[in-house]
């Protein structure tokens, strides 16, 4: 009887206190990710998705022609920083809390990781991504106007014009596609990373919950999960097309996710839906290493330094 009681006690999932330092940690991690390799990969990926006739090398050359090395960091300050600081905090906090809730319901690490990531991704999209993706579109429009010889408007002027003409719906254009992208992104990344992590534990014999993976094992699991999550590239191409300001007389009006999918498939076939998948895989690996791999290690570091227990492990 005592052994049964001890086993039950060992299996109890403790409720971790919500830590403000953990929310700030999410913002700092994403800011670090986007300021290093994240933004260059994002710019190349978006260029390929918007110009589906470009190869990877043509996209790299095109971006370089728009400002050299600085061309790869267009939109970083302030728009990508605003997006990174808000979406990182939301993702890390919400997904951690959701994963704890799902584990409390009896779900295993893999299922809890997927559902925690999905919950964090959807919340991320509707809470922060509408404004941020609008600002990115404004930045792209400003550069296109300048390169075409027109008088470039300020970002805020274009933003005001969009809001004046289309209202809230205009500045949140494509938000449903963003929500689908985010929930499949982070559901895949957290779930696959946890699945790989469980496999590593079995191979290395670290089956006890108190056994820690070393940094290389943790980053390897995170990177593999991030790379595999690029399976949903079609929804990313759809998102770019819905928010693109590129003039195209053939593009249908009042685009929905379904209409955009049909248009891209008819225009460019299946290859068009996967345009930009190479930099996307690189971006997925880079983002996941930061948010999942370094995130877990950084939370443990914060706990040692501040005495606050991190919310949960993703």
From Swiss-Prot:
One MF term in the entry's GO annotations: DNA binding
Keyword line: DNA-binding, Membrane, Mitochondrion, Mitochondrion inner membrane, Mitochondrion nucleoid, Repeat, Transmembrane, Transmembrane helix, Transport
Pfam families: Mito_carr (PF00153)
Disulfide bonds: none
Gene Ontology terms: cellular component: mitochondrial inner membrane; mitochondrial nucleoid; mitochondrion
Solcar repeats: 18-100, 107-199, 217-301
Keyword Mitochondrion: yes
Subcellular location(s) of the protein: Mitochondrion inner membrane; Mitochondrion matrix, Mitochondrion nucleoid
GO biological process: alpha-ketoglutarate transport; mitochondrial citrate transmembrane transport; mitochondrial genome maintenance; tricarboxylic acid transport
DNA-binding region: 246-259
Knockout consequences: Shows slow growth and respiration defects in minimal medium. Shows growth defects in acetate-supplemented medium; the phenotype is enhanced by addition of hydrogen peroxide (increased oxidative stress) and/or double knockout of YHM2 and ZWF1. The cytosolic NADPH/NADP(+) ratio is decreased compared to wild type; this effect is enhanced in the presence of hydrogen peroxide. The mitochondrial NADPH/NADP(+) ratio is increased, but only in the presence of hydrogen peroxide. Levels of cytosolic citrate are reduced, but only in the presence of hydrogen peroxide.
Name assigned to this protein: Citrate/oxoglutarate carrier protein
Other notes: Present with 2930 molecules/cell in log phase SD medium.
Membrane topology note: Multi-pass membrane protein
Residues that span the membrane, as ranges: 23-44, 77-97, 111-127, 178-198, 218-238, 273-294
Activity-regulation annotation: Strongly inhibited by mersalyl, p-chloromercuribenzenesulfonate, mercuric chloride, N-ethylmaleimide, pyridoxal 5'-phosphate, bathophenanthroline, and tannic acid. Partially inhibited by alpha-cyanocinnamate and bromescol purple. Weakly inhibited by butylmalonate and phenylsuccinate. Not inhibited by 1,2,3-benzenetricarboxylate or carboxyatractyloside.
The protein's role, per its UniProt record: Mitochondrial antiporter which catalyzes the transport of citrate and oxoglutarate across the membrane. Also shows specificity for oxaloacetate, and to a lesser extent succinate and fumarate. Transports isocitrate, cis-aconitate and L-malate with very low efficiency. Does not show uniporter activity. Helps to maintain normal citrate levels and NADPH/NADP(+) ratios under conditions of oxidative stress. In addition, associates with the mitochondrial nucleoid and binds DNA in vitro, although the relevance of these data in vivo is unclear.
């Amino acid at each position: 009887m005592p052994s049964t009681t001890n086993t039950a006690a060992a299996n109890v999932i403790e409720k971790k206190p919500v830590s403000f330092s953990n929310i700030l940690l999410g913002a700092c991690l994403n800011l670090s990710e986007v300021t290093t390799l994240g933004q260059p990969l994002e710019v190349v990926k978006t260029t390929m998705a918007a110009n589906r006739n470009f190869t990877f090398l043509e996209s790299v050359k095109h971006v370089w022609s728009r400002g050299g090395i600085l061309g790869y960091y267009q939109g970083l300050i302030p728009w990508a920083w605003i997006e990174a600081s808000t979406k990182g905090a939301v993702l890390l906090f919400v997904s951690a809390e959701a994963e704890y809730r799902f584990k409390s319901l009896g779900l295993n690490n893999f299922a809890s990781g997927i559902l925690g990531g999905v919950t964090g991704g959807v919340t991320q999209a509707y809470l922060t991504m509408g404004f941020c993706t609008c600002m990115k579109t404004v930045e792209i429009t400003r550069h296109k106007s300048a390169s075409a010889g027109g008088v470039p408007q300020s970002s805020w002027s274009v933003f005001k014009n969009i809001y004046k003409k289309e209202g809230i719906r205009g500045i949140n254009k494509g938000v449903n596609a963003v929500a689908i992208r985010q929930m499949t992104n982070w559901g895949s990344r957290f779930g696959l990373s946890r699945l790989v992590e469980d496999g590593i534990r079995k191979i290395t014999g670290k089956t006890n919950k108190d056994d820690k993976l070393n940094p290389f094992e943790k980053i390897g699991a995170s990177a593999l999960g991030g790379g595999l999550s690029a399976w949903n590239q079609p929804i990313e191409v759809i998102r770019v097309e819905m928010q693109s300001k590129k003039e195209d007389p053939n593009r249908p009006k009042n685009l929905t996710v379904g209409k955009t999918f049909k248009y891209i498939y008819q225009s460019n076939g299946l290859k068009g839906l996967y345009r930009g998948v190479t930099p996307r895989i690189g971006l997925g690996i880079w983002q996941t290493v930061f948010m999942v791999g370094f995130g877990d290690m950084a939370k443990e570091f914060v706990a040692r330094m501040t005495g606050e227990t991190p919310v949960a492990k993703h």
